[in-house]
Amino acid sequence: MKSGRFIGVMSGTSLDGVDVVLATIDEHRVAQLASLSWPIPVSLKQAVLDICQGQQLTLSQFGQLDTQLGRLFADAVNALLKEQNLQARDIVAIGCHGQTVWHEPTGVAPHTLQIGDNNQIVARTGITVVGDFRRRDIALGGQGAPLVPAFHHALLAHPTERRMVLNIGGIANLSLLIPGQPVGGYDTGPGNMLMDAWIWRQAGKPYDKDAEWARAGKVILPLLQNMLSDPYFSQPAPKSTGREYFNYGWLERHLRHFPGVDPRDVQATLAELTAVTISEQVLLSGGCERLMVCGGGSRNPLLMARLAALLPGTEVTTTDAVGISGDDMEALAFAWLAWRTLAGLPGNLPSVTGASQETVLGAIFPANP
């Protein structure tokens, strides 16, 4: 069973940077050693946003984007190696999620697409890469997402305490770690995605730092109710979603009924949408004693305060409180999934994704010996 240093690379739906984590992993423990966040050039970020909202590309443009993202991920890995004075030979493998540009796990031909050419990463780092983690689960009838509940269970499950782990990235997803029950998990809906899209269009800022804009506004209750009527929120698990559904176009369709509103009020309403949809799912899933929050949304004081208010019987903390940085959780999970793939161990949980069976995930892109 392979053990040693692994690197996890995550570029999520929030597009706030490439998260890279270095960890030692074996069958007994996962120990984070270092991490960094690598910026995504504005032009590349916009190209990804465009394709996620259905803008048509030529095959040449799509191929260029795939290559550019692969090179970006490699640059991020090499920066971490340089910072830690490590060589390629010191790393067992890289687990790279890739950049999701489309996720459609239902219908006649279910599919999900993560790009960022793994061959570019191998060629530019000299390290074996494990990637393309989601499509095997979809081939077995699953949603292909979320995959992190298996990691949350391995690290954070408790024998007697009802726990849930909430990742608030672009999309928010919930892991249900309930003693005596199969692990559960699904996407609750938008996390930071709509808030980020709104402030980017209205104020040219990548995100609402410390929720300053949202806290300056007031929740527009009719708009909130209008958005909450979306059928996704009442859809039973297993379910997953992404930017191809909850995007700026989705927000515009709801705002058509509310002309002339204060942009800060919209920001406040979007924050409340995220908090309400999460808290409703926590309660519908039977509630928990402790909700551990990670992802960019864990740094949003308004979201954290609203979750605590909406879940009065629950201790709401960040995963930092149990020794895992909320900023690095997902990248760390994909380092762990790479370890499981190389060890020949399954990485999905059918109780979460709805797949017909457990399976080894991903494709291996070996480095030259």
Swiss-Prot record:
EC number, UniProt record: 2.7.1.170
Residues that coordinate or bind ATP: G12, T13, S14, L15, D16, G17, V18, D19
Transmembrane segments: none
Keywords from the UniProt entry: ATP-binding, Carbohydrate metabolism, Kinase, Nucleotide-binding, Transferase
Protein name: Anhydro-N-acetylmuramic acid kinase
Domain of life: Bacteria
SUPFAM superfamilies to which the protein is assigned, alphabetical: Actin-like ATPase domain
Family: Belongs to the anhydro-N-acetylmuramic acid kinase family.
Native organism: Shigella boydii serotype 18 (strain CDC 3083-94 / BS512)
Catalytic class of the enzyme: transferase
Pathway recorded for this protein: Amino-sugar metabolism; 1,6-anhydro-N-acetylmuramate degradation; Cell wall biogenesis; peptidoglycan recycling
Single GO biological process annotation from the record: peptidoglycan turnover
Gene3D superfamilies, A to Z: 3.30.420.40
Known catalytic reactions: 1,6-anhydro-N-acetyl-beta-muramate + ATP + H2O = N-acetyl-D-muramate 6-phosphate + ADP + H(+)
A UniProt-annotated Pfam family: AnmK
InterPro entries the record matches: Anhydro_N_Ac-Mur_kinase, ATPase_NBD
GO MF annotation list: ATP binding; kinase activity; phosphotransferase activity, alcohol group as acceptor
Function text: Catalyzes the specific phosphorylation of 1,6-anhydro-N-acetylmuramic acid (anhMurNAc) with the simultaneous cleavage of the 1,6-anhydro ring, generating MurNAc-6-P. Is required for the utilization of anhMurNAc either imported from the medium or derived from its own cell wall murein, and thus plays a role in cell wall recycling.
